[in-house]
């Protein structure tokens, strides 16, 4: 089940925009807001749409997984990279969907709304295979692996936003414990060659700008993972502008393991 609109697509558990790029907290939010306006208008009429079920699944199977202590995984923000810029607006969308929901799905939407609102009781592991993206959750932390391949694109740049997002495609591994790790000015002052978990050259050369996702993918098709809904493992073969490496993550209960090997750059310093 999916909805397409130009270069955007809403698939059961995720929203993507400008190619297969995680983009829920900005473009996806507006996509849902526009769709909800029509669903609310047609409520209790003969024009009611089955599209409501798709939005419910989007939140129960996807959106609630990326929130921790009212913060969202920055991987889902596209070029507007942030962990909290649109959190309150997304909570409002969840409330509107909840009000439209029938009794058979009302409880699952209520739980999704609670998790978006700061309840961290959602635990498990989920592999979003269409986007080379894994989320792992326990009561006391949330983490994610954002891989890329020839099929997917990392955080883009455009209209002057996201001009330092190039390395956001290199295997970012965000970790939330307090929920305050990446809010405030974090993305304005951090070293753009040191996104959490990435493999990148540490030099002063100008960064390529991934305008509208151009150059934001990976040169190797190998990226993905496996999950039994509680534990998971994922990995990618990095190949970008001569930089190569094998990256993998293994997710357990009180710990997870990040491994890197075969790192090389024949053209590097």
Predicted regions and their residues:
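Broad hydrophobic/π-residue packing in well-ordered secondary structure
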Residues: 3, 15-16, 27, 41, ...
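Aromatic-rich surface patch/π-platform used for binding flat ligands and interfaces
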Residues: 8, 24-26
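Extended polysaccharide-engagement surfaces of secreted carbohydrate-active enzymes
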Residues: 31, 38-269
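Aromatic- and histidine-enriched alpha-helix N-cap/loop-to-helix transition segments
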Residues: 26-33
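Acidic/His metal-coordination segments adjacent to aromatic residues that form catalytic metal sites
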Residues: 12-22
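Single conserved hydrophobic/aromatic residue that forms the stacking wall/gate
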Residues: 1-7, 11
């Amino acid at each position: 089940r999916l909805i397409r609109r130009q270069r955007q697509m809403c698939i059961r558990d995720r929203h993507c925009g400008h190619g297969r790029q995680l983009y829920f907290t900005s473009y996806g939010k507006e996509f849902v807001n526009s769709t909800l306006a029509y669903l609310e208008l047609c409520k209790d009429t003969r024009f009611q749409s089955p599209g409501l079920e798709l939005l419910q699944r989007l939140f129960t199977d996807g959106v609630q997984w990326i929130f921790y202590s009212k913060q969202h995984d920055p991987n889902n923000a596209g070029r507007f990279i942030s962990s909290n810029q649109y959190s309150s607006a997304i909570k409002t969308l969840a409330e509107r969907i909840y009000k439209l929901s029938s009794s058979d799905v009302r409880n699952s939407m209520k739980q999704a709304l609670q998790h978006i609102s700061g309840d961290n009781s959602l635990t498990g592991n989920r592999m979003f295979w269409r986007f080379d993206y894994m989320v792992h959750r326990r009561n006391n932390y949330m983490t994610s692996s954002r891989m890329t391949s020839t099929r997917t694109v990392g955080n883009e740049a455009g209209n002057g936003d996201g001009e330092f997002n190039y390395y956001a495609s290199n295997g970012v591994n965000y970790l939330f414990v307090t929920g305050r790790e990446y809010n405030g000015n974090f993305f304005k002052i951090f070293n753009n060659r040191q996104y959490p978990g990435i493999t990148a050259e540490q030099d002063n050369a100008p960064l390529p700008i991934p305008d509208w996702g151009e150059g934001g993918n990976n040169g190797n098709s190998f990226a993905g993972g496996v999950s039994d809904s509680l534990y998971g493992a994922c990995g990618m073969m990095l190949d970008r502008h001569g930089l190569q490496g094998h990256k993998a993550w293994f997710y357990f209960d009180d710990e997870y393991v990040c491994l890197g090997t075969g790192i090389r750059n024949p053209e590097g310093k």
